[in-house]
Each structure stands twice: as C-alpha cells, then as structure tokens.
C-alpha cells in the first residue's frame, strides 16, 4: 500500500463534484435557514459552472460560503459541514 501516491489523488473535477454532493445535503436540509440554503445553492452553481477553470469555480464557492459561515442562525452541524466543504475546495489546484 502506497500512501500519498498520485493514483489516490482526486482530480479537481472529482473534488468539485464531491463538493456539489455535500452542498446538496445542506440545500435539502429543512432545518437550515432559507438564506443559508440559498447561499449553498449559489455555491453549488459556482462549483458546477461550465467554462471556468476549476480554481476559479472553487474560489468563487469559498467566497460565498465564507460570507455565510459566521451567520448566528446557522445550526452547528451545518457550520461544520461548511468548514469541511471549504477544506475540500482549498484542495483544488
């Protein structure tokens, strides 16, 4: 078993598709306030936007999520999800 090999690295597109799935969890969670779900939807659209480089799509989504990450109405589990999503997006090169 080889750790850290290039074969186990995800491509930027794979990372972005995984992030879109993670954002779907927030979008479909009715316990999350509407403004936060709307921002998650906006971030998902940015991540899946065709015609832009993956790094640009990632940076746009990070910016959107960063703006809402300190919302006092955000449930704690959602804040944790957003931090995880941002960590994934930061891996895109």
Swiss-Prot record:
The protein's superkingdom reads: Archaea
* Entry-linked InterPro entries: Ta0600-like_sf, UPF0147
- Membrane-crossing ranges are none
Pfam families assigned = UPF0147
Instruction: Give the similarity note.
Output: Belongs to the UPF0147 family.
HAMAP family of this UniProt entry?
UPF0147 (MF_00342)
Give the protein name, as stated in the record: UPF0147 protein MJ1419
Q: What species is this protein from?
A: Methanocaldococcus jannaschii (strain ATCC 43067 / DSM 2661 / JAL-1 / JCM 10045 / NBRC 100440)
